């Protein structure tokens, strides 16, 4: 008989907790903390716990360490699940359990009735090994076929980041890896707060913060704090860290926007726009021209007449040597703010670049037909 998933997190304080520190494309994005339902499926939970600690040594079937460390999420299907656990072949064809190559389905007590559930991947009945998946939506068609044995209690935002990684088919285009993993004992910190020395005291993902996302004043307070930290990194020319903090602001704002009244959304818009523009500025400093253009386009969706976005977008086009595109954006900006001297100076510079480019082309043609 199946039962609904536990409403509380954690469902049982005596159940083991484990963690994954996740890297996407070589960059640490955060920690997922999982409760294992040892009270309901002890054998399945123990298998996963030991694979997180690596305490069982080498697997007799694979000849590889029975450990998730360094193991990729090899399969991602948006609005379905993220899958990993193949520590031997790293492509979905390998892995093994701590009990041998495979072990039986323990029970189907819990349903796949929401996101954030941890369940065993298999190749049919009684073929559990080391591979697992985390649901990102309810998946009722898997009930009675896959053993649900845990749940995400912190770091659901990290799971969502994995879910939204670009894929080729079902394979992530960027390497998504369990960089570190282990068990959290009673009294251990869960590791969801940043430790970057910036003074940032907020969890990286709003889902993990003990706040009411409908409290707009609180969200604005947190957002201003994070933005100021981002500005400090910007001033010290630490562009990557600045982007991380501005992006974190946007996560908090987006989570709040999803649950508040439309009238309150407008209160969040100015700081959101500012952070998107600042991300664009950082990308310009990093010579990430297309990234800067994309950020400016995002800003222009919020405010189509924003001259700062048009100006920075033009700088991105210049980096790509698309001077005609840059000229078009600067002309739009000048129409909106005809007295802006910075726009005028940039416009003159781009016109000179276009002239120099044309003169160079003429010289090439002249040599060809001389």
From Swiss-Prot:
Keywords: Acetylation, Apoptosis, Chaperone, Cytoplasm, Isomerase, Nucleus, Phosphoprotein, Protein transport, Repeat, Rotamase, TPR repeat, Transport
UniProt KW Transport keyword: yes
One Gene Ontology CC term in the entry: nucleoplasm
Residue span(s) of domain PPIase cyclophilin-type: 19-183
TPR repeat extents: 223-256, 273-306, 308-340
Disulfide bonds: none
Catalytic activity: [protein]-peptidylproline (omega=180) = [protein]-peptidylproline (omega=0)
Highest taxon listed in the record's lineage: Eukaryota
GO annotation terms (biological process): apoptotic process; cellular response to UV-A; chaperone-mediated protein folding; lipid droplet organization; negative regulation of apoptotic process; negative regulation of transcription by RNA polymerase II; positive regulation of apoptotic process; positive regulation of protein secretion
Modified residues annotated as N6-acetyllysine in this record: 171
InterPro entries (UniProt xref): Cyclophilin-like_dom_sf, Cyclophilin-type_PPIase_CS, Cyclophilin-type_PPIase_dom, TPR-like_helical_dom_sf, TPR_rpt
Endpoints of the signal sequence: none
Cellular compartment(s): Cytoplasm; Nucleus, Nucleolus; Nucleus, Nucleoplasm
Residues bearing PTM Phosphoserine: 5, 198
Keyword Oxidoreductase set for record: no
Region (Chaperone activity): 185-215
Function: PPIase that catalyzes the cis-trans isomerization of proline imidic peptide bonds in oligopeptides and may therefore assist protein folding. Proposed to act as a co-chaperone in HSP90 complexes such as in unligated steroid receptors heterocomplexes. Different co-chaperones seem to compete for association with HSP90 thus establishing distinct HSP90-co-chaperone-receptor complexes with the potential to exert tissue-specific receptor activity control. May have a preference for estrogen receptor complexes and is not found in glucocorticoid receptor complexes.
Family: Belongs to the cyclophilin-type PPIase family. PPIase D subfamily.
Protein name: Peptidyl-prolyl cis-trans isomerase D
Organism: Rattus norvegicus
